[in-house]
């Protein structure tokens, strides 16, 4: 979708724009694209799905709802975290972020013109609870959209800040706290 849109914009419409595509070297099944999400893919995010709470195996005081946002290969960890939260009796809205930069650009353009509500804000209005944004970039990348999160919502970012580490993907994701268990733990903490 993004490559097709970019090629049309550059070649057919002759716009002076720059596109880049980040490639990952991890093998994973690409999640199915929900219907009617083409605009969201191009504009930076779309609602991937929603999980309704199951009765938790162990009764807990914590229930409620959270919103998880994930990009790139970390989206698979976000989906696993959502399943863990669902098993704990928590409702989860899941958003796939295709471009933190595009979301930030849209928000900044809106700051300048003030003509409409930023796209990210619109998308998050129908979700619930604290928002956990996970990325395999440094936390500063998802932080670029903080200003466009609905005002009454807690927003926590998770990323891979640091350098010089070498290990397995699983170990590195656990170390940087962007694995499913860490994302679920961040959501539980945000619900306190």
Which residues does each predicted region cover?
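Thiamine diphosphate
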Residues: 1-192
């Amino acid at each position: 979708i993004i490559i097709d849109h970019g090629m049309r914009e550059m070649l057919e419409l002759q716009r002076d724009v720059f596109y880049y595509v980040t490639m990952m070297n991890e093998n994973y099944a690409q999640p199915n694209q929900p219907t009617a999400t083409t605009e969201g893919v191009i504009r930076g995010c779309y609602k991937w799905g929603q999980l309704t709470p199951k009765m938790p195996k162990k009764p807990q005081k914590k229930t409620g709802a959270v919103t998880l946002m994930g990009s790139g290969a970390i989206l698979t960890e976000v989906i696993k975290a959502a399943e863990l939260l669902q098993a704990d009796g928590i409702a989860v809205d899941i958003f796939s972020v295709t471009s933190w930069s595009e979301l930030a650009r849209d928000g900044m353009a809106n700051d300048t013109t003030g003509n409409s509500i930023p796209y990210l804000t619109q998308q998050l209005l129908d979700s619930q609870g604290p928002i956990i944004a996970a990325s395999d970039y440094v936390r500063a990348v998802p932080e670029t959209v903080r200003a466009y999160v609905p005002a009454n919502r807690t927003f926590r970012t998770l990323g891979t800040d640091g350098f010089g580490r070498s290990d397995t993907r699983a170990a590195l994701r656990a170390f940087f706290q962007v694995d499913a268990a860490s994302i679920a733990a961040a959501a539980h903490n945000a619900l306190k």
